[in-house]
Every structure is written in C-alpha cells, then in structure tokens.
Amino acid sequence: MEEKTVVILGATGSIGTQSVDVISKLKNYKLVGISFGKNRNLAEEIVQRFDVKVYHGGVELSVGRRVDSIGALLELTKPDITICAIPGFEGVKATIEALKYTRRIALATKESMVCAGKFVKELAKKNNVEIVPVDSEHSAIFQIYEPHIDHIVITASGGAVRDLPLDKIAGLTPEEVLKHPTWNMGGRITVDSATMVNKFFEVVEAHELFDLPYEKIEVYINPSSFIHGMVFLKDGTIKIHAGKPDMRVPIAYSLTYPSREYTSYVAQVDEFDMRLLPVEKARYPLFFFGLEIAKSGGLAERIAFNSADEIAVQYFLEKKILFGKIEKIVTKTVEEVQKRAITVNSLEDVYKVDELSRKITEEVLYDCIN
C-alpha cells in the first residue's frame, strides 16, 4: 500500500492526541504536519516522535519549522488526509483552509457543518475533496447508511446531568460537569454534552452530511454510549452500529476508509447495552431550542448559537458564571441576532455573523454578571 501523508489540525487536543495514537499503530500513514495552541511540551513530543518537519503553533518549538498560518502549513505539506480537530469557530476557518489543499478531510470539527455546512460542501465538491466524519455517531451512520432510508437515530450519553434531580443542575460547578459518564473529551465538548448542545450540533451535522430533513433524524439517550447510530430502512430493516466508546476507532476509520486496518477491543454479548431513553425537555432545554432554530432554516441563528455557546462555556469553565446561565446567554444572543433577519450568502457573511454574535454575547454576559 502506498504511504499516505497526514496533517492534524489541533494535535494537542483530545481528538488530536488520540489521532496521534492511532497513526502510531497504523502502517503506511505518515504524520507530516501539525497545528496546536500553546501546549509546547506535548507538541514538541509529537514533532520529535514522528520527525514532523513543519508545524503551526502558538509557541516556538526547539525542533521543526514553524509557519505563520494553517494555510501555509497545508500549502507546504499538501497532505492526503487532514484531520480537522480544532474546536469552535477557529475550527471552521481551519476546515475551509484544508479544503484548498487536501484530498480527504477527517472531520471532527462539527462547527464546520453547523456554521458553514453549505459552503463546506460546495468547496469540497469543487475541489474534489472527500469528507469522512470522525464523530462516533456520524461515523456510525456513514458506515451503515444506504439510500432506501426511512430515518436515522443518533444517540447521546446525557452527560453529567443525566441522572441528577432537575433542581440541582443550574448550580453545578465545572468540576461536577466535567465528570462525563462514558467519554474522555475536551472541556467545551464535555460541557456541551451536559447541555446536549453537542447533540444539537450533531443533528445539524447529520442533516448536512447526509442531506436528511430534520424530521428524519431522531435522538435517544443510550446511557453507556454503546449504540452509536441506527439506520431504519423502508423495508423494515434496522441497521445498528455499536461498540465500546473509544474515539480511536472512528478516527482510524476516517483514515483507512474504505478498508479497516485498526485493531481494538471487541465487546462480548453480555456487555451489550441496547437501552434507548427519550430526551427530557426540562433537563436539556438548549437542545430543543437549537432544534427549533435549525428547523426554521436560519443559518445566521446557527452561527450565533455556536458563538454564544463557545463564549458562555468558557466563562463557565473559568467559574465566572453558573452552569444554569449558559442557556440564558445562548438563547438571548440567538434571539437578538434573529431580530436582525440576516441572510448568509457567502463565507464572508459567515465570518461577519460570528463577529456580530460575539459582540452581542459579551453584552448579554455583562448584563448577567452585573
């Protein structure tokens, strides 16, 4: 097999480090570039271990060549595969850059589809770039999807608030919310799991990736995260993708597709957990609010939702606001953007709406804190 080159954008984050682990166990995949934020020690370890020649990062390393942008990194390396694992709106920009230089995007940055799905798909088609999802749920649907479809189910864990009394949720601390029951993930996505904002984003991502109307995408809680996705076909067949929760498995598949080259834990029958529980509106109001704005068709509102959530979660993690304030900040910001009736016709419009939404969020936060 011919060697394939890989760049990881967001190499020192949760998905990034697991991607590094996967590449170390696969043959014929060469890591040729990374981007990272400020984690110098981990970045240096990766660069030295894989003899990476080029990187983009927030700090200088003692080895390798530092370039001043993700675009420059990708232009120099022109990788076969780019793993897009930068969270938030910065990840959207990185995905757009990757579409110019790579042959396949292993997409973990769900915000790319939430904020710019239409434009990402157009660029991918124009540049003949393959998009393979990394999220466990979308990887699951990707693997079992076929045209004669009635609807799909993606699952949620319910996060740290799943079994708590409703009156205890609003006052939760970051330490309590970051105790995810089944997955080991980064800070923002773990908080987004507790609010189920993450699952709202995944519904939008499924809508964009598989061209499915929202009414054909259902969400249920599977407490152990054993079931990742289900496809219901029109002839009555139900296809289920399941397995122990381990992000390295979908990461590996996004690299090796259509073949399977990665070896992992194989679950036994007595470990199967097929419980599917409804999502409670009172417990996860932001999830349902997100679905409402998505179904209304407004891309500006989706962008505003992401911008507000990104900032609100950071404030929560820094202990500047209570957990219960996240919902108020996001809904208020989206409603303010909604009043402006903004039409998003280009990527430039996407960036402008994000900038506007962040300004509005800061104003909403000021009112919440003072």
UniProtKB/Swiss-Prot annotation:
* Pathway where it operates: Isoprenoid biosynthesis; isopentenyl diphosphate biosynthesis via DXP pathway; isopentenyl diphosphate from 1-deoxy-D-xylulose 5-phosphate: step 1/6
InterPro entries, sorted = DXP_reductoisomerase, DXP_reductoisomerase_C, DXP_reductoisomerase_N, DXPR_C, DXPR_C_sf, NAD(P)-bd_dom_sf
Please list the residues that bind Mn(2+).
D135, E137, E202
Q: Any idea which positions bind NADPH?
A: T12, G13, S14, I15, G37, K38, N39, E111, G186
UniProt record, GO biological process: isopentenyl diphosphate biosynthetic process, methylerythritol 4-phosphate pathway involved in terpenoid biosynthetic process
| Keyword 4Fe-4S attributed | no
Its Enzyme Commission number(s) read 1.1.1.267
Source taxon at top rank = Bacteria
Gene3D superfamilies, alphabetized? 1.10.1740.10, NAD(P)-binding Rossmann-like Domain
Cite the GO molecular-function annotations of the record.
1-deoxy-D-xylulose-5-phosphate reductoisomerase activity; manganese ion binding; NADPH binding
- Cofactor(s) this protein requires: Mg(2+); Mn(2+)
Tell me the function of this protein.
Catalyzes the NADPH-dependent rearrangement and reduction of 1-deoxy-D-xylulose-5-phosphate (DXP) to 2-C-methyl-D-erythritol 4-phosphate (MEP).
The family assignment reads: Belongs to the DXR family.
What name does the UniProt record give this protein?
1-deoxy-D-xylulose 5-phosphate reductoisomerase
